[in-house]
């Protein structure tokens, strides 16, 4: 199965993020389902929400283009996923990476529908083996998770997490540091602070 992911020209801009304005479809299987998902991605340029946002931000509706990325979908529904920033978005402090993590597919974290775990990492110490660069680990409630749906027309389902899942951190120390190093690498490549999404494959452990 795969994911049909929208990517518009007016996204993640300094003055307007356009976060969540276009649609992404998860757990898509088969050619017909993929074509349908792509059509719906294109059509999401003209939802009430997207039109209203462009009007508010002063963007010409006819000047916004959209492409679609079709990706292999890893089984993060069997593990965890989330988002990370190469800067502290609340304070603007540039020397930390901030990682959010929850069980299941990352859509719950992106949409703000779940209280995720949060990790704060001091970037300058990532290459210093003598020091521990993890500043803080905060356990989130993680009361629900999004998983693959079985049968029917719905591709995903949101279910309650177990008590054990709520009490455990999604990431261990090695995984936190690996993600933080990727955040630094990506930030260096683009030459500016970046926000990223990540997912762990529950079948391969990667």
Please give the residue ranges for each predicted region.
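Conserved mixed alpha/beta core segments that line enzyme active sites in large multi-domain catalysts
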Residues: 1-206
């Amino acid at each position: 199965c795969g994911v049909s992911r929208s990517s518009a020209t007016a996204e993640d801009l300094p003055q307007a993020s356009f976060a969540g304005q276009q649609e992404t479809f998860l757990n898509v299987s088969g050619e017909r389902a993929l074509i349908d998902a792509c059509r719906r991605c294109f059509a999401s340029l003209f939802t009430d929400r997207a039109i209203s946002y462009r009007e508010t931000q002063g963007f010409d509706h006819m000047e916004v283009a959209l492409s679609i990325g079709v990706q292999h979908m890893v089984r993060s529904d069997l593990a965890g996923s989330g988002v990370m920033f190469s800067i502290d978005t609340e304070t603007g402090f540039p020397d930390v990476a901030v990682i959010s993590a929850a069980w299941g597919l990352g859509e719950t974290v992106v949409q703000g529908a779940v209280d995720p775990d949060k990790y704060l990492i001091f970037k300058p110490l990532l290459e210093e083996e003598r020091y521990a660069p993890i500043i803080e680990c905060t356990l989130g409630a993680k009361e629900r998770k999004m998983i693959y749906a079985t049968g029917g027309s719905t591709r995903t389902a949101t279910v309650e997490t177990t008590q054990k899942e709520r009490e455990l951190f999604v990431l261990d120390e090695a995984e936190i540091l690996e993600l933080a190093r990727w955040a630094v690498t990506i930030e260096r490549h683009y030459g500016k602070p970046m926000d990223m999404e990540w997912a762990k494959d529950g079948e391969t452990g990667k």
